Amino acid sequence: MTEELVTLDTAKMLREKGFNEYCRFVIGEDRVISDIISTWNLPPNSFPVPTQSIANKWLRETKNLHIEIYRSACGYGYAIVKANNGTWMKDDDAKGPNDGGNWDTYEEALEEGLQEALKLI
């Protein structure tokens, strides 16, 4: 069992929205993931790449957005709500890639939810 890292697209969006936390890894435009010691002097075109869990926590604590992952007979989906009061913001509208409009794994649904939450900022 391993922690999932966010994708390059999500890492780029996180940086655009102000994510500046230390991450053990960076990802380049070539999609190669490398270990780093410091976020100072990152290689050109490299982006800090957190785990999905850290990205989710950052959104919750700094942007007041909580991503709820739910399970149905068709797979996994997500809803985005305000972290402080549960006010609905957006959900997946059954737009997932499988036949039931969901995602086959929890991690796929969370990745999509992360990207959609970042678009709301």
Q: What do the predicted segments below correspond to?
A:
Residues 1-8, 25, 105-106, 110:
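Catalytic phosphate/metal-binding cores of nucleic-acid and nucleotide-processing enzymes, i.e., regions
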Residues 12, 16, 20, 25, ...:
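N-terminal segment of the canonical double-stranded RNA-binding domain
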